[in-house]
């Protein structure tokens, strides 16, 4: 029986503004003393300022894809390369042009800490793969998934070391820009890491796990900034994904395709009509379409476009399948091998230590005295 994973909150604890705004219907500015404005009038005044900044026909980067919801809400998806300076500029320009009501980023609550770190601290953290990080990954995801997460972190550390650029700069820029937009909310739109890694590990055979781990362990190819910027081209990304599908199709499904569905669902949830405040209950309710900016890796953009108008059921991709019989056997074999290696290592170390100890003159002298003192039969 599959056990459903608990779904964490999707809205960041560090939300810039907790009040939602609107995207149309510029209200009239009311005259009078600002100190005597009601809450509704103050809201309308700030909303008008926001809408004046919002461009009707925004000049957007070529990495932005525009999607329209059934109710007229608009979603601007910024496709990014996670180590790219150009992507950071694309995110800033898009948010300033459209003045969104919601910003959704490709992060979950387990990675939200990167929004609070400065560039230097994050660069140092990204380069370090410590025992503490390994223990934390294993506690969160289990042994196999935790080890796989550390291998992927090793890949990220390799890129960080090659480029000297910390990952996730576009998300930090999105967070800062969202805090400058009136009534803009900040949402975490990615599936929780533990769910993704557990489903990925469950989808791979033992041989595929070994093959993938081997490839990640010995990754050492040099990477240039030009390589990262070329990742913003859809044709190159599709070629890379096609190669990945051929070798690890189940891994591509769990890490890319399923997250495409999840990100699409979260963007659609954010793109809902917004209700304007009323001066009194007697006034009729008025709702307007919203404007949303999504910040995701370029590799997810085709999947989001594909899933935008389809019916989505994220419960199917939020469950972790139970381990198979072969999976349980392989885990026991790995644990037995690890214990065997540990036992042999302790035996060899102890034997070597005893040999070195007995080779000392003082130890030989003590043994000789004990032998002389022992009663002979």
From Swiss-Prot:
The modification Phosphothreonine is found at residue 65. Keywords: Acetylation, Phosphoprotein. InterPro entries: TraB/PrgY/GumN_fam, TraB_PrgY-like. It comes from the Eukaryota. Transmembrane segments: none annotated. It holds the Pfam family TraB_PrgY_gumN. Disulfide bonds: none annotated. The modification N-acetylmethionine is found at residue 1. Residues 1-34 are annotated as: Disordered. The keyword Acetylation applies. The keyword Iron does not apply. This is TraB domain-containing protein. It comes from Bos taurus.
